[in-house]
From Swiss-Prot:
The keyword Mitochondrion applies. The chain crosses the membrane at residues 83-102. The keyword Transmembrane helix applies. It is a single-pass membrane protein. It is found in: Mitochondrion membrane. This is Altered inheritance of mitochondria protein 39, mitochondrial. Keywords: Membrane, Mitochondrion, Transit peptide, Transmembrane, Transmembrane helix.
Amino acid sequence: MLTRSWRQRNLASLLYSLSHRRLLSQKIPDPKHVFTDPSNNEIVDSKHFFTNPSRDNLIEEEAIAKSIEASIKNQRRRRGKQVSSALAAALFATIFGYTIGYKVLYLHEHSFIPAYPVPKARNFSSNELKHINVDEIKHLAEYKLLEKLSMHPMIKEQYGVPLHKSQGISLESRQFSVWRQDVDPCIAGILIAPIDSPKDEHTWHNVPPLCKWRITNRSVNFRSFADQVLGRVGIDSSDLIQVIKPEKDCGDFKYGRPPHHSDGPRTMHICFLGEMKLGNEDLIIFRGTCHIDLKLQQVDLLRKENDKLVRYVLYHETKE
């Protein structure tokens, strides 16, 4: 009797341990999915909720979508070309209709069409050089240079005064070049004139029987443009801006006249750069400007010392 009850207890404990191990080995179910198993759920494509397309249908749909996209792009491109061509035609008709039709043919005046900006510093043309006495500018620059060098203590001590290339022969510039420096920003463009306008020294290209044209440069004076705009509403720029020092505002052009060969009231400097040999291997480099008066801006001395090229700044213009 005891052995039978003992066997029953062992069997019960064995079954309990097996069932406990099975429960521990099983995965705890997700409380969010008590009644369903998410592993068996299929993800349905939202684009094809009611249909299950085959591969052939997908290829056809992609081809249709690509053709629609291409047609939309072509339509937008065609519309953009039409708008841009219409704007270009309107701009062309407005500019050339006003400049040629109204100003040149009707009013018989010169007209300027701006094209692109150009730098302020540029070389003189052959026609402009005819009206500039380069030899006189060179002579004045050499005179100013020798004056500055003769007053410099280093030149007095090492080279002596007066300065001479050799006995009885004064120093002269070895190289001398000039160019122009405009004050205001400059724009290159087409200058159009009536076909029967008087001839001048410039080279013109005729468009018979309408007009003639040439490429030229014009300066843009923002202050005069602002004066014109304010003058239309009855306001003067002096009412808004008070110039404390007129010489600082106008610079060297306060009492200057524009060159008579220029196309308009353009203020410009004549800039120059020269070289003068001082001694056997010493070289003087000088540069400056010329408008009403000639001014030196900088004078440098270049010479070799211990097989090295050394630069001495003998004079540099300081602006107050």
